[in-house]
From Swiss-Prot:
This is Sodium/potassium-transporting ATPase subunit alpha-1. Belongs to the cation transport ATPase (P-type) (TC 3.A.3) family. Type IIC subfamily. It is a multi-pass membrane protein. Signal peptide: none annotated. Residues 6-85, 151-286, 337-770, 822-841, 937-949, 1005-1021 are cytoplasmic. InterPro entries: ATPase_P-typ_cation-transptr_C (IPR006068), ATPase_P-typ_cation-transptr_N (IPR004014), ATPase_P-typ_cyto_dom_N (IPR023299), ATPase_P-typ_P_site (IPR018303), ATPase_P-typ_TM_dom_sf (IPR023298), ATPase_P-typ_transduc_dom_A_sf (IPR008250), Cation_transp_ATPase_P-type (IPR050510), HAD-like_sf (IPR036412). One of its GO terms (biological process) is proton transmembrane transport. The keyword Transport applies. The modification Phosphoserine is found at S16, S38, S45, S226, S450, S482, S666, S941. The gene is ATP1A1. One of its GO terms (molecular function) is metal ion binding. It is found in: Cell membrane; Basolateral cell membrane; Cell membrane, Sarcolemma; Cell projection, Axon.
């Protein structure tokens, strides 16, 4: 059994040992997969097939031969995509990005504690506490993120259906049903309507067989399958049926030519799993932010390390200072804050029908600048619907809305009654059983898409089709075939005063018209003259130009004298007229746009997002839907439109004059990357029609070359490579295939394009709110770190301890920081351009300068003011404190004098110092009130925004209550060395809090009054 030419290109190559070779090979494989499908089995005659596969075309393989091939090729199943082991996922959460910074902090703390323990007799435990707490923070937030991701992957698992699929094969001349996984190359397989195709088949005989290829090629119409070789392209030819597509009607028999990963579907799945998803924008932002923070921390640490050596501290003390400064700079609570903010948004999106698989995808959607959307089922309803009728020489519009709230037409015309009768009788579609309580449009139908559309339309307009069919019982029928291009049936006519037999026919309009000599107008038969033929032609062109699928309908009342009751009609040797019929009308169908889509596309446009339609459907249909949903907006022309308007050949039009553009897949095949870039750059509204899955991938890569952040929507297997390659892949939850759901980052549970726009809005909002959260959290770093610096430089007793810093970062600041995630959008965020990931960072210099250089400095002043007030009240005036540190911290000196000559023992001094730590801590809480309120907005006044955020108000109360609890709770003096404060000491920082609020309101006022001015350039983060 020789291997065919096509086969060799499918064989997955062996994996090479060396890293570089491996990488080069992977790239080569990807390029190979991006090429179009190549196979030659569709060109072979039956004899050649028999020789190539050694299969008897009537008896099939022998069981023994099948077992040999199964052992050689392996089971007929797709290799599951490589999954990441759970422990690796967990480690990623524990050691990725921000966590790494905290781990380094923890290690440094243990190091400092080790140095102190080795050099001092009674070391302080601060650094030990700090190290333990930091480690705990990382582990807890790591577990939290891991749990969140595991939860969404559980939902993913539940999507997979566990029913093993069966296939009917012929072996040793006997039909047997086996597991589809056991099907081998060369097997003779039978399929019937409702079956899933078990492998790639070369059809050798068929009877009215149609398959639904939409998951593979994106065509919404069922495609006929027959033994005829009709097209060079294996995806277009009729004699190949593809693995995992569905047979919708008829029967067929075929030989298996490819199984498992070597099938066309298998190649696409391999293509998807071989693609590397890039880093998400938010991950890049957090990395950039860590670089900034680490940079600042190390710079400060090293500067003060050198400074303390110059100030003649011992190098051990200097190392302790270095570590202290670096740790004080790490915002311990931020990791948890970011995780919680993303989780909250993911939950909010799930309520709006967007299931996010990994948290970071939440924000990616917000920075999207291009959406490549599939047409069928995403932009459209994925159900063929009657859109227009042409009868009585005029076009009538049908109601295509999802809830039947649209237009209606005159249903009393005698011609309409005749037309609806033909559409109901000359129709094999039937409603499935037990659905009487469902609305008509929601009922499931057995039959092809066009006939289902006619059935539903007639049922809605004229009542029960079943009763109509019972009244006019069917006698004989000629089913639709590709040579005649019509379907005909003859029925008993129960109407009194009319002949006993009614012949009804439907089919391709031009073929039907050729068989007619008269036409029904207002219920009266008229001869079909040239004028009426022109009217027909115009109507046909108009409906076809709307991208609709048009069918013609005609009938004939068969005269009783020729066809008496009981006449034997013969469909093989036709003994009844099929010419000189009476033309009744046209009905056209379309898969109509979803109701919410035009509005969603409009929102995308005002948000600066380019929506590109990519579909396997016909260019005319694609263009019509694109116009219907606003992807091509009114007044925008394609090159062809301009040529038609100016009456010149297309070649004379400058392509850059056209805003819109419809690109055919076959043209895309021959384009260089530069030509594709040209199209993507110079046309604002683009439709790609008749595209293959590989081309979808090329389009996504083209958009990414332009620097766009690309979201791709799709439901078919054919979309999975593009879903994986895109910055964010969006799969359909209802119609989506398993492969596409695995490749995507987000799943639309209601399959509605409008949900994506909701997602974009949420993504932009979370980016804004994360900025605010970070600005709020970072500000308190300055009042936390300056006490340490002044302690080193001015040699004063330490104003704020390590434990109190932790109480701020992991205690009082947490809830307020998270509450900012609930803040509403301050301006219309869907009216601005998508952010540019190169320039518009989550944390930029302006944010750092605001948090550290301005607000943070005011906060530090507030803290020091409180510190000096308490020291002075206890007898130590500021000038007396300078240079006192060494004697102050010496536990053997018990007679340190204050400004009034009073002597203090070591224990007494420490109680004053720790009271100062507590007061400094409370002052930071007081100034953080103002900081939280000003962080609510970046441009608007707080008075415009209002205080509607209930969580934020709770946050203010929570941080105050926690501060009071830590200060006044009995036993805190022992546990955390925090002491009760006089009520007046709480008020020391109030003026500074007010100053922060006023300062920032004035700054925002100037920004609003002078947009683009110096203040905005320097301080708008």
């Amino acid at each position: 059994m020789g291997k065919g030419v096509g086969r060799d290109k499918y064989e997955p190559a062996a994996v090479s040992e060396h890293g570089d070779k491996k990488k080069a090979k992977k790239e080569r494989d990807m390029d190979e997969l991006k090429k179009e499908v190549s196979m030659d089995d569709h060109k072979l005659s039956l004899d050649e097939l028999h020789r190539k596969y050694g299969t008897d075309l009537s008896r099939g393989l022998t069981t023994a031969r099948a077992a040999e091939i199964l052992a050689r090729d392996g089971p007929n199943a797709l290799t599951p995509p490589p999954t990441t082991p759970e422990w690796v996922k967990f480690c990623r959460q524990l050691f990725g990005g921000f966590s790494m910074l905290l781990w380094i902090g923890a290690v440094l703390c243990f190091l400092a504690y080790g140095i102190q323990a080795a050099t001092e007799e009674e070391p302080q435990n601060d650094n030990l506490y700090l190290g333990v707490v930091l480690s705990a923070v990382v582990i807890i937030t790591g577990c939290f993120s891991y749990y969140q991701e595991a939860k969404s992957s559980k939902i993913m698992e539940s999507f997979k259906n566990m029913v093993p699929q069966q296939a009917l094969v012929i072996r040793n001349g006997e039909k047997m049903s086996i597991n589809a996984e056991e099907v081998v190359v060369g097997d003779l397989v039978e399929v019937k309507g409702g079956d899933r195709i078990p492998a790639d088949l070369r059809i050798i005989s068929a009877n009215g067989c149609k398959v639904d290829n939409s998951s593979l090629t994106g065509e919404s119409e069922p495609q006929t399958r027959s033994p005829d070789f009709t097209n060079e392209n294996p995806l277009e030819t009729r004699n190949i049926a593809f693995f995992s597509t569905n047979c919708v009607e008829g029967t067929a028999r075929g030989i298996v030519v490819y199984t498992g990963d070597r099938t066309v579907m298998g190649r696409i799945a391999t293509l998807a799993s071989g693609l590397e998803g890039g880093q998400t924008p938010i991950a890049a932002e957090i990395e950039h932010f860590i670089h900034i923070i680490t940079g600042v921390a190390v710079f400060l640490g090293v500067s003060f390390f050198i400074l303390s050596l110059i100030l003649e501290y011992t190098w051990l003390e200097a190392v302790i200072f270095l570590i202290g400064i670096i740790v004080a700079n790490v915002p311990e609570g931020l990791l948890a804050t970011v995780t919680v903010c993303l989780t909250l948004t993911a939950k909010r999106m799930a309520r709006k029908n967007c299931l996010v698989k990994n948290l970071e995808a939440v924000e990616t959607l917000g920075s999207t600048s291009t959406i490549c959307s599939d047409k069928t089922g995403t932009l459209t309803q994925n159900r063929m619907t009657v859109a227009h009728m042409w009868f009585d020489n005029q076009i009538h519009e049908a109601d295509t809305t999802e809830n039947q709230s649209g237009v209606s037409f005159d249903k009393t015309s005698a011609t309409w009654l005749a037309l609806s009768r033909i559409a109901g009788l000359c129709n094999r579609a039937v409603f499935q059983a037990n659905q009487d309580n469902l609305p008509i449009l929601k009922r499931a139908v057995a039959g092809d898409a066009s006939e289902s559309a006619l059935l539903k339309c007639i049922e809605v307009c004229c009542g029960s089709v079943k009763e109509m069919r019972e009244r006019y019982t069917k006698i004989v029928e000629i089913p639709f075939n590709s040579t005649n291009k019509y379907q005909l049936s003859i029925h008993k006519n129960a109407n009194a005063g009319e002949p006993r037999h009614l012949l009804v026919m439907k089919g391709a309009p031009e073929r039907i018209l050729d068989r007619c000599s008269s036409i029904l107008i207002h219920g009266k038969e008229q001869p079909l003259d040239e004028e009426l033929k022109d009217a027909f032609q115009n109507a046909y062109l108009e409906l076809g130009g709307l991208g609709e699928r048009v069918l013609g309908f005609c009938h004939l009342l068969l005269p009783d004298e020729q066809f008496p009751e009981g006449f034997q009609f013969d469909t093989d040797d036709v003994n009844f007229p099929v010419d000189n019929l009476c033309f009744v009308g046209l009905i056209s169908m379309i898969d109509p746009p979803r109701a919410a889509v035009p509005d969603a596309v409009g929102k995308c446009r005002s948000a600066g997002i380019k929506v590109i339609m990519v579909t396997g459907d016909h260019p005319i249909t694609a263009k019509a839907i694109a116009k219907g949903v606003g992807i091509i907006s009114e007044g925008n022309e394609t090159v062809e439109d301009i040529a038609a308007r100016l009456n010149i050949p297309v070649s004379q039009v400058n392509p850059r004059d056209a805003r819109a553009c419809v690109v055919h897949g076959s043209d895309l095949k021959d384009m260089t990357p530069e030509q594709l870039d040209d199209i993507l750059k110079y046309h604002t509204e683009i439709v790609f029609a008749r595209t293959s899955p590989q081309q979808k991938l090329i389009i996504v890569e083209g958009c990414q070359r332009q620097g766009a952040i690309v979201a791709v929507t799709g439901d078919g297997v054919n979309d999975s490579p593009a879903l994986k390659k895109a910055d964010i892949g969006v799969a359909m939850g209802i119609a989506g295939s398993d492969v596409s759901k695995q490749a995507a980052d987000m799943i639309l549970l209601d399959d509605n394009f409008a949900s994506i726009v909701t997602g974009v809005e949420e993504g932009r909002l979370i980016f804004d709110n994360l900025k605010k959260s970070i600005a709020y959290t970072l500000t308190s770093n300055i009042p936390e770190i300056t006490p340490f610096l002044i302690f080193i430089i001015a040699n004063i007793p330490l104003p704020l301890g390590t434990v109190t810093i932790l109480c701020i970062d992991l205690g009082t600041d947490m809830v307020p920081a998270i509450s900012l995630a609930y803040e509403q959008a301050e301006s219309d965020i869907m009216k601005r351009q998508p952010r540019n990931p190169q320039t518009d960072k989550l944390v930029n210099e302006r944010l750092i300068s605001m948090a550290y250089g301005q607000i943070g400095m005011i906060q530090a002043l507030g803290g020091f003011f409180t510190y000096f007030v308490i020291m002075a009240e206890n007898g130590f005036l500021p000038n007396h404190l300078l240079g006192i540190r060494v004697t102050w911290d010496d536990r053997w000196i018990n007679d340190v004098e204050d400004s009034y000559g009073q002597q203090w023992t070591y224990e007494q001094r420490k109680i004053v110092e720790f009271t100062c730590h507590t007061a400094f801590f409370v002052s930071i809480v007081v100034v953080q009130w103002a900081d939280l309120v000003i962080c609510k907005t970046r441009r608007n006044s707080v008075f415009q925004q209002g205080m509607k955020n209930k969580i934020l108000i709770f946050g203010l109360f929570e941080e105050t209550a926690l501060a009071a609890f830590l200060s006044y709770c009995p036993g805190m003096g022992v546990a955390l060395r925090m002491y009760p404060l006089k009520p007046t000491w709480w008020f020391c920082a109030f003026p500074y809090s007010l100053l922060i609020f006023v300062y920032d309101e004035v700054r925002k006022l100037i920004i609003r009054r002078r947009p683009g001015g110096w203040v905005e350039k320097e301080t708008y983060y």
